[in-house]
Amino acid sequence: DLRQCTRNAPGSTWGRCCLNPMCGNFCCPRSGCTCAYNWRRGIYCSC
């Protein structure tokens, strides 16, 4: 359901939605990804 999806953060195309996990300011490429953190800040998706 698109209403449930997370808005992509600034820097992405406005109006796009993220159906996958968000990591920091970006959208992970697949639903099974987890976010790797550095000092509590999301730095990259681990897929």
Swiss-Prot record:
Expressed by the venom duct. It is found in: Secreted. Keywords: Acetylcholine receptor inhibiting toxin, Disulfide bond, Hydroxylation, Ion channel impairing toxin, Neurotoxin, Postsynaptic neurotoxin, Secreted, Toxin. It comes from the Eukaryota. Its main location: secreted. Disulfide bonds join 18-27, 23-35, 28-45, 33-47. The modification Hydroxyproline is found at residues 10, 21, 29. Coiled coil: none annotated. GO terms for molecular function: acetylcholine receptor inhibitor activity; ion channel regulator activity; toxin activity. HydroxyPro-10 is only found in a minor form. Belongs to the conotoxin D superfamily. Alpha-conotoxins act on postsynaptic membranes, they bind to the nicotinic acetylcholine receptors (nAChR) and thus inhibit them. Through its two C-terminal domains, this homodimeric protein would bind to two nAChR allosteric sites, located outside the nAChR C-loop of the principal binding face and at the adjacent binding interface in a clockwise direction. This toxin specifically blocks mammalian neuronal nAChR of the alpha-7/CHRNA7, alpha-3-beta-2/CHRNA3-CHRNB2 and alpha-4-beta-2/CHRNA4-CHRNB2 subtypes. Homodimer. Pseudo-homodimer (identical sequence, different post-translational modifications). This is Alpha-conotoxin VxXXC.
